[in-house]
Amino acid sequence: MKISDMALRDILPLSLTGAPCVSIQRQAMLEEAICLLVPYLETMTDSLVVAGDKNEPLGIIGGKEIIQCILASQGDISKIRADGIMSHTITKITGATKLRELVEAWMKTGRAFSIIPNSIGGYSAVSARKVLEICKGAMTDMAVSELPKKETITFKPNSTAGEVMNLMIKNRTRRVLLEGTNQYVSDRIIIERIATDLAYLQNPAGFLQLPVIGFGLEYAKVLPKDLKINELASIMFGMLHPYVLFRGHVISPWDICLAALSERMLEYG
């Protein structure tokens, strides 16, 4: 059976709700949201859920919202509230939701993140990393070389933080590669830099002019040979920050999410 036609609770009966959402109150300030978000970007949780007065989910704050806020700033933004920058689009699913329905919902929202009710009366997060967990246990003959080739977005050694952040928003990507290398900068790296000195929020224009190459770039894993998609999913699931380079093309968890829709991704056994 195709994994895309299976209900999430049947694929992951034990771990589907294993990543409780990290929430932040709607009246919390931007600096609090940044400090809370940094440890969770690219994990099972990945984003913050903005909670209302009765702890009901109102919206989401991820790397995209922080970057958009800084790019649009006209001065001191340190006192902007969480509900002033959050995305109001929040996808709620259940255990009966099929994998195909989940990924198609993410394709519509442009965000690989949903919330699902859990057994303790709250919500758990379902992100792209959960799909990596699903795909590593699938059976397939589909190879990495068969993934659709996409344009690799790059930046130059003298690019500023603002230029790279604009590239991210324009191209709807969370990672940008340093041209001619396997080094990259991500929304997480940029937000980590802000968290080291929250005074940047009082002068975002100055932050946008900083050379991004000094932010501490990370290395995409270079894949030396062609693998099956389930093998790559297993490798990426084990990576702290999953990002792979294969024959000059980058592969992110989102590419694995799209591959999960293939008729060749089957239930194991």
Language-model regions, residue ranges each:
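Tandem CBS (Bateman) regulatory domains
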Residues: 1-19, 62-91, 101-109, 119-153, ...
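Hydrophobic, helix-prone linear segments
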Residues: 1-61, 65
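Conserved glycine-centered beta-strand/turn positions repeated across beta-sheet architectures
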Residues: 56-59, 114, 122-124, 180-184, ...
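The conserved cystathionine-beta-synthase
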Residues: 22-45, 52, 92-111, 117-118, ...
